[in-house]
């Protein structure tokens, strides 16, 4: 089975972020919730995929992803900040994901942490990844 360009991009992002933040787990939902005992984790979620332009048989697309670092405890601020710093550096090291995309840019970051509950923090950062496919075949780059 041939994977879509979008899925190949998501897997490349997952691989880069996982290598950068190891041994912190990177989780792509749907999956089981992060346990309180896990300490820190990074969640990779897809916020959307939109069509930006059509040109003959080529479609320009924008995939929006969210990386959310979550942690519990007294070191939570340092842990989530460090996880996102490492993940960001890994993504920006090769913004075209070794030829899979046209580029990646930070779309939004919420450096004001969200309180999940007492002692828990979530720090999200969003990225936009531009890429091209053929209009008739989502598995082929345009």
Residue spans for each PLM region:
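Charged, amphipathic alpha-helical segments and their flanking helix caps
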Residues: 1-34, 47-142
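Charged, often glycine-rich, active-site loop that binds/positions anionic groups
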Residues: 37-47
